Every structure is written in C-alpha cells, then in structure tokens.
A protein has these predicted regions:
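Nucleotidyltransferase catalytic core that binds NTPs
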Residues: 1-154
Length: 154
C-alpha cells in the first residue's frame, strides 16, 4: 500500500548511510517524507551537532541522491523525556499530519503506536559499520573530523 506522507524521526548525529537507507526504503511506501530531527535542544557528547548542522547534512545527502524533492519538510523536535504527551503534541504541531511512521527506536515507536500511529520497521543497514555511537567516537578521536564525516555522510 502506498501512503501519501510518512514520518522519520531520528537524532541523525550525524546523518549517515544507514539513515539514507531508511529514507530510500520509506520512499517505497510513501509519496513524501517529513523528517523530524530529534534532541534538537540537547548539546553534549552524544549530540554534538546542532539542528542546523544536521539539517544541512540531510539536505546535502538527499540532494546528492536526487531525493530532496521527496522531502516535504525537515523539522526540529526538542526532547521532553518526562512528558511523552507534550513531546507528541510538539511533534504534531511541527510535522502536521502524516499517514505512517518509519523507524526502529522503540521509545519513539511506543509513543507513536500508543496514539494510533502505524509504524513500519526496517532492518538496520550495516549496523556494525553505521552506528552513531561508533561514528561520534571516531570523530572525537580524529585529528581531522571532517575526513571522518566525509567517510560516513553519504
């Protein structure tokens, strides 16, 4: 079944080939995608890139692969770890309506499913290679983090 609009939520710290795989898979099921960039209000070692930086990574990658025209919008979503209802309300305000969501984050999926949102989960793409924790660690240890980013950002 083809849906009109889908939603992908992620931190994208940074946007890497695994995320590109998710976008490509999702676009097989929808006409347009909304990308919600989570943890927009957090800056720490697990969230080193700002929303604006992550949005640029996403746009550049999707433009390179001629997918940017399939993105309805890219929005920022702040974390509210103790208030799932408020988080979902903020998500709805920023994204508007969507028909389906895609992802593997069980906390996010639980919030969405408890509110009647259908979720499609895809197998993770080369998780041993494309995992944000490992990529961020490699960036931290590198004398030239830009080379590491080029290695992982599609």
């Amino acid at each position: 079944m083809k849906y009109k609009t889908g939603l992908i939520i992620g931190r994208f710290q940074p946007f890497h080939r695994g995320h590109l795989y998710l976008v490509r898979q999702a676009l097989k099921s929808v006409d347009l995608l909304i990308i919600a960039v989570g943890s927009a209000n957090i800056n720490d070692e697990n969230n080193p890139f700002s929303f604006d930086e992550r949005k640029k990574f996403i746009e550049a990658s999707l433009n390179k692969y001629k997918l940017l025209n399939k993105i309805q919008k890219i929005v920022s979503i702040d974390d509210y770890p103790d208030d799932d209802d408020f988080w979902f309300t903020q998500l709805e305000k920023k994204t508007g309506s969507f028909d389906i969501a895609f992802g593997n984050n069980e906390w996010v999926n639980g919030i969405l499913e408890s509110r009647g949102v259908k979720i499609i989960r895809f197998p993770l793409f080369k998780r041993d290679k494309y995992e944000g924790v490992k990529i961020r660690e490699e960036i931290r240890k590198s004398k030239n983090p830009h080379l590491i980013l080029k290695k992982y950002i599609p």
